[in-house]
Amino acid sequence: MNYGYQKKTTLPFDKVDNLIRKSLSKVGFGIISEIDIQKTFKEKLDINYNRYKVLGACNPALANEALNIEPEVGMLMPCNIVFWENKDKSVTISGIDAEKQLSNTNHNDLIKIGQDVNKLLKEAIDAIK
């Protein structure tokens, strides 16, 4: 499945966690939610899962623009960035395809915002070497 833009890095998980937050901030996104899947699965299900985080990222200017066009679009927010540690200790980083998600609205102005979001998320992810 292709839910968004993805890349792999050999950087350690904790380093990726730190760098992706900084990189998202540089392109105008703040982190408004965070889920530590490994911790949550251990606490709730007593399952040992690989290291995996979900960051809910929001660009306030683009969110404001989208909500002014269609208030219901808030159900599609925030933009999720996920990263997980693979068996070989590499880390995969993936950002939602906002254009694809917003194409369901059939509203050209929202689709354009999705394109802008994708460009910024790709820039943030590509900054992780």
Each model region followed by its residue ranges:
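Terminal, regulation- and interaction-focused segments at domain boundaries
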Residues: M1-V27, D126
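Short secondary-structure transition/capping segments
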Residues: L24, M75-D88, I125-K129
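Compact, glycine-rich, soluble single-domain proteins
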Residues: G30, D36-C79
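Beta-strand/loop substructures that line and gate deep hydrophobic ligand-binding cavities in soluble
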Residues: N80-H107
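Well-ordered alpha/beta subsegment
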Residues: N104-K129
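Short amphipathic alpha-helical/adjacent loop interface patches that line ligand
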Residues: D17, N59, N118-L121
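Short glycine-/small-residue-rich flexible loop motifs, especially phosphate/cofactor-binding loops
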Residues: R21, Q38-K39, K122
